[in-house]
């Protein structure tokens, strides 16, 4: 089940006519890591960072370290990883989402 943040992202992405993304995409077989949203053919990923103002797992010691390890592994495998917070989607969704679309477009000449 998608979080409120994931649902908000998906709604905004559709409104801006973004290409299809795969939710909860498993990119690392050994570690079973998943990316919140992925465009696998271009290796573009979106990670949504919830709980940043409520001392959520992503901003506490081990959780932050684990996320860094995951993002570094994705980057080493060629992924462009975009990290977004709820306020980034609220305050300037067009700028933040079109930046992701621009990289997808750059990596995939067949898309628009």
Predicted regions and their residues:
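Nucleic-acid endo/exonuclease domains
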Residues: 1-112
């Amino acid at each position: 089940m998608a979080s409120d943040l994931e649902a908000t992202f998906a709604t905004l992405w559709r409104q801006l006519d973004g290409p299809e993304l795969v939710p909860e995409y498993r990119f690392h077989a050994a570690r079973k890591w998943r990316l919140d949203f992925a465009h696998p053919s271009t290796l573009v990923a979106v990670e949504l960072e919830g709980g940043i103002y409520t001392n959520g797992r992503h901003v506490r010691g081990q959780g932050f370290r684990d996320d860094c390890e995951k993002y570094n592994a994705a980057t080493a495998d060629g992924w462009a990883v975009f990290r977004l917070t709820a306020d980034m989607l609220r305050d300037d969704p067009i700028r933040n989402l079109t930046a992701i679309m621009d990289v997808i477009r750059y990596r995939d000449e067949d898309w628009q």
